[in-house]
């Protein structure tokens, strides 16, 4: 299936299910849908993406930096910051500096970002909430987030259907998020919700360590 055919098929599906794709601009033509499709992850040099591994705070800032519209990124681009642990020559400096300037990511303090540390589920949910500030969904909560600093962020993105908790009713906000969980959450933010393999475009990037039979 060509990208054009895929866009046309997705466009018709989105019109038929507008409640699910409520954040998309459904007045657009199929050819324009591609403008809202971003390649935001890159595998490792060995060709794997390590879905069950952790994602660092620097990697997270870079992913959301790539998701910015070009005009937003270009108009707010920063190459310096106040973090002592993110020097100008750090590989993710521009992403961290820009996303901090936009208020989407935050450091542990004004002078420390801890870029190589893995990111927690609460921190990731908060970034998703700051990245898309549109209308909220239904109220939803979990048994272990009352009084947590990210409670309102978590409740909002859960109500929008972007994040899921665990079967025991917990969210485990301070647990680290896996790469697969993070990408699943981002895809929900972007309304990339393929229901079957035929919904996926031909020629899409794949990784040998991602089992197509698994939920992610």
Which stretches of residues belong to each language-model region?
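BZIP DNA-binding basic region
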Residues: 2-13
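Feature responds to low-complexity, polar/acidic, surface-exposed segments characteristic
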Residues: 16, 23-93, 102-122, 129-153, ...
């Amino acid at each position: 299936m060509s990208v054009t055919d895929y866009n046309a098929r997705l466009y018709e599906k989105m019109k038929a299910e507008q409640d699910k794709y409520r954040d998309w601009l459904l007045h657009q033509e199929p050819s324009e849908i591609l403008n809202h499709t971003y390649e935001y992850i890159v595998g490792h040099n060995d060709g794997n993406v390590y879905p069950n591994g952790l994602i660092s705070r620097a990697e997270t800032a870079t992913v959301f930096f790539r998701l910015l519209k070009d005009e937003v990124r270009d108009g707010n681009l920063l190459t310096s910051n106040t973090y002592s642990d993110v020097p100008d020559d750090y590989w993710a400096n521009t992403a961290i500096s820009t996303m901090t300037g936009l208020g989407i990511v935050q450091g542990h303090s004004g002078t420390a970002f801890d870029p190589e540390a893995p990111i927690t589920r609460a921190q990731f949910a908060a970034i998703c909430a700051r990245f898309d500030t549109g209308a909220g969904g239904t109220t939803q909560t979990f048994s272990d987030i009352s009084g947590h600093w990210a409670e309102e962020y978590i409740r909002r993105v859960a109500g929008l259907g972007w994040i899921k908790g665990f079967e025991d009713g917990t969210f485990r906000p301070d647990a680290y998020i896996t790469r697969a969980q993070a990408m699943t959450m981002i895809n929900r933010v972007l309304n990339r919700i393929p229901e079957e393999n035929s919904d996926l475009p031909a020629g899409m990037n794949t990784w040998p360590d991602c089992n197509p039979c698994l939920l992610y």
